[in-house]
């Protein structure tokens, strides 16, 4: 859980920086001064923005090339693309059939689905409720991400792996806060509100992500598990993004679409909790054994 706290915290920090930077890059006032410098190849604002993004990606590539190899034994991978795809789907099904893996995968998938669309929701809400421009609203997206980072760090210090499922009820509260967001129309309320909502998300995702990777590592290895996790998370981002876009496309206001989005989160988290309780009732021995494995490998000194 502590390792996941660091990983998620740094990931969310990068999101904060990306959102704030993106908000500044679309500000026409910035490029008025930059274009006046007469830099070669930078004749339009889009040229400068793309050049900066390419530079950032280049720096990231250099960092990735310097990551040291570990001594962990790698599991063999099929060389043929067809066999590789079949192996992926087997791993996907295996993780969804695991009594703890399915719960943690469902929770983290939903969280990242919400997180991936949160920036668009906050932009739309800030424009409708606070009459903010895109640049101004981008700072509020950063506020949500800041809260998520804080929640991730707190969870890494307070939640043990074998108690990860205890944070799931907070998911319903997070969805309810999304619904309540439509009633917030003052900045002094919005900032702590968004920080708290982000912190809830961070507090949920770190222990559940740690539990998911623990089960994935035991079932199929870390690499395959991460591939399955990312596939499901990206699919959820697309699905929830389509839901939000379809809602606004059908004529719903930004407030109504956000409320619908939050209601979907509440219902989804309630169903995941019912699913977990069903597993506890009907697969008690298996759940207890899996929790013993988690406790044994992550027991405090």
Where are these regions (language model features)?
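Substrate-agnostic recognition of the 12-TM MFS/MFS-like secondary transporter fold
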Residues: 1-27, 103, 111-120, 144, ...
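Small-residue hotspots at the loop-to-helix junctions and early N-terminal turns
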Residues: 5, 134-142, 227, 258
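A single, central transmembrane helix in multi-pass transporters
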Residues: 13, 20, 26, 31-50, ...
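Helix-to-loop junctions at the C-terminal end of transmembrane segments
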Residues: 26, 150-164, 248-249
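Helix-loop junctions on the cytosolic side of multi-pass membrane transporters
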Residues: 45-46, 50-80, 161, 273-286
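Hydrophobic residues within the alpha-helical transmembrane core of Major Facilitator Superfamily
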Residues: 58, 109, 146, 179-180, ...
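MFS-fold secondary transporters
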Residues: 63-64, 180-181, 197, 272
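C-terminal ends and interior cores of transmembrane alpha-helices
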Residues: 172-186
